[in-house]
C-alpha cells in the first residue's frame, strides 16, 4: 500500500540517523504532521521540538551547523518561507551553512487548513536566496533519494514535500542524477 510522501521522508530521516551520528532533527511543534516523529522515536537524543518558533528553530540549526551537525528543520512549507525567512537568508544562506529544510504540506496539499497554510510561493522565495538548493519531489522513490541527497550535499537545501500519497512515477531502484 502506498504511503504519504511525508511518511517516506520521516522513515528516511530515521534510517539516515542510524549511520550519521551528526544528523539532528528540529521540528516546530508539528512532528506528527511532518513525520519527523519517526526520527524522534529512533533517535530521541538528537531530536529537538522547538515549539511554534520557526525563526528560533532556523537560528538554532545555523548554530548547530557551525559545530559540525547536519540539522534538518521541519515545519509546514508556508512557515519556512514566512516565519523563518530572516534567519534562513541572513544566517543559513549567506553563511552557506549545512542546514536542510523539510517543507511539509507544500502547494495546496494542506487544503483543509485553508489559504493561510498554502505554500504556493515557497520555491519562488527560496530560489532567490544564495546557495540554496531546491528539491521538489514527485513520488516515494524521489523522496527517499532527495532526503539522502540533502543529507550528503554541502550547504542549504530545501526539500518540498506534499502532504498526500502520490502515485509512483519511478521504480524504487531508479538512479537519479
Residue ranges and their predicted role:
Residues 1-166, 170, 174-177:
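Thiamine diphosphate
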Amino acid at each position: 500500500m502506498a504511503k504519504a510522501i511525508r511518511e517516506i521522508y520521516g522513515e528516511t530521516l530515521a534510517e539516515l540517523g542510524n549511520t550519521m551520528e551528526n544528523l539532528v532533527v528540529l521540528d516546530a511543534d508539528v512532528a506528527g504532521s511532518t513525520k519527523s516523529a519517526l526520527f524522534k522515536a529512533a533517535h530521541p537524543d538528537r531530536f529537538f521540538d522547538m515549539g511554534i518558533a520557526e525563526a528560533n528553530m532556523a537560528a538554532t540549526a545555523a548554530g548547530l551547523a557551525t559545530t559540525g551537525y547536519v540539522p534538518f528543520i521541519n515545519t509546514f512549507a508556508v512557515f519556512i518561507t514566512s516565519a523563518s525567512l530572516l534567519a534562513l537568508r541572513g544566517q543559513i544562506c549567506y553563511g552557506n551553512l549545512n542546514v536542510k529544510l523539510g517543507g511539509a504540506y507544500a502547494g495546496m496539499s494542506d487544503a483543509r487548513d485553508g489559504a493561510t497554510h498554502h505554500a504556493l510561493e515557497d520555491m519562488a522565495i527560496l530560489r532567490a536566496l544564495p546557495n540554496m538548493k531546491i528539491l521538489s519531489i514527485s513520488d516515494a522513490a524521489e523522496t527517499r533519494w532527495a532526503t539522502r541527497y540533502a543529507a550528503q550535499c554541502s550547504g542549504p537545501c530545501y526539500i518540498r514535500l506534499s502532504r498526500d500519497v502520490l502515485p509512483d512515477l519511478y521504480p524504487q531502484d531508479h538512479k537519479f542524477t
